[in-house]
A protein has these predicted regions:
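Active-site gating loops and adjacent loop-to-helix segments of metal-dependent hydrolytic enzymes
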Residues: 2-31, 79, 84-96, 154-185, ...
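Hydrophobic residues within beta-strands of alpha/beta enzymes
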Residues: 50-52, 147, 239, 309
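Metal-coordinating catalytic core of metallo-dependent amide/deamination hydrolases
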Residues: 59-194, 199
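Active-site-adjacent C-terminal substructures of enzyme catalytic domains
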Residues: 180-316
């Protein structure tokens, strides 16, 4: 359902588009066809590794994991948890149901995959009660699982979290209280971080939380522009995300371009102290920056795993010979006119 409902903001889009679509995945026939398309698109894309949200349904999540295993890509896939503020047709009816289904899913994935890893996935704080967060934190600690979720994406969402969790000083604390926000050698990635304040940023850095910058999604849903220049300058861990279906494409090349474009708008219109991103910085976020969530990935340096693309840029012919840096920039900006000849994932 990419490319639909792009005239709405986040919360309206979730209720109008996302939740009704996700409910269809309880039908395995529908899920198989939809996930087959997704797996094929991912295999054809420039992506070698990804974190993926499935739905709350155990069987369809396992189906997606099986399909992604066959692509050869390295992925972390999560069964979504949500026990409040969701439609009756999609919500997990109790903390116990959510916990039982999540344990069942983890049991069924144990030792089954070479390329796919389970990742705990509380949808976001508005959809997960404190009791559920507490139980998921215990699961994370017991099984040493990575975590993915959303953080400070939309102004209305941030205000809603404050209403739901008045005890929290900021959004990130609603995860951190239950051990779901990095720290203790835990791998956590939070999408968006558009409105993360200074205290939240300090905790992210202290706990080693990864930021998945999703510029196209943040633009499509009118969420805002994350201060990525500040994150990079402060030494935060930052990678790029497509956030489909909030984003309309899985292309990381387009994510790189979007990241540069929105940083220029933020610099010009909102804060001239935060200089725009450069092409090398955007490329770093799409390779080594995001790859670090998976280990030593995203570079050709000694000791790194061999993830690589062979890209044919001969379609970008020009009378003047180009150096390697210029060729890379053109591939990033004109990726639709290039051809991906091969892809390798360690």
């Amino acid at each position: 359902f990419r490319g639909l409902g792009m005239d709405m903001e986040l919360l309206a889009w979730l209720n109008t588009n996302t939740f009704p679509e996700e409910a269809r995945y309880r039908d395995l026939k529908y899920a198989k066809e939809a996930y087959r398309i997704f797996a094929q698109d991912m295999k054809k894309s420039a992506t070698t590794r990804a974190c993926v949200f499935a739905t709350r349904h155990v069987d369809s999540t396992l189906l997606l994991m099986n399909l992604m295993e066959k692509t050869g890509l390295k992925t972390m896939i999560g069964k979504v948890n949500m026990d409040r503020n969701a439609p009756d047709y999609l919500i997990e009816s109790s903390v116990q149901e959510a916990l039982d289904e999540t344990k069942d899913w983890l049991k069924k994935t144990h030792g089954k995959f070479n390329n796919v890893t389970p990742i705990l996935t509380p949808r976001f704080t508005p959809a997960c009660s404190d009791d559920l967060m507490k139980e998921l934190g215990a699961l994370r600690e017991k099984y040493e699982l990575p975590v993915q979720s959303h953080l400070s994406e939309n102004r209305d969402e941030v205000a809603w979290v404050k209403e739901l969790c008045p005890w929290s000083a900021f959004y990130g604390e609603t995860y951190d209280k239950y051990g779901l926000f990095g720290g203790r050698n835990q791998n956590t990635v939070m999408a968006h971080c558009v409105y993360s304040g200074e205290a939240e940023q300090r905790l992210m850095k202290e706990n080693g939380v990864f930021i998945a910058h999703c510029p196209e999604s943040n633009t499509n849903l009118a969420s805002g522009i994350a201060p990525v220049r500040k994150y990079l300058d402060d030494g935060q861990k930052v990678g790029l995300g497509s956030d489909v279906a909030g984003g309309s494409t899985e292309s990381l090349f387009k994510a790189m371009v979007s990241a540069i474009l929105v940083s220029k708008l933020r610099w010009r219109l909102a804060d001239e102290s935060l200089k725009p991103l450069t092409v090398p910085e955007a490329f770093y976020m799409g390779t080594k920056g995001g790859g670090a969530f998976f280990g030593k990935v995203g570079s050709f340096e000694p000791g790194y795993e061999m993830d690589a693309l062979i890209v044919d840029d001969s379609f970008l012919a020009w009378p003047k010979e180009r150096n390697l840096r210029d060729r890379l920039e053109r591939v990033i900006y004109l990726s639709d006119r290039c051809e991906l000849r091969a892809k390798y994932t360690a």
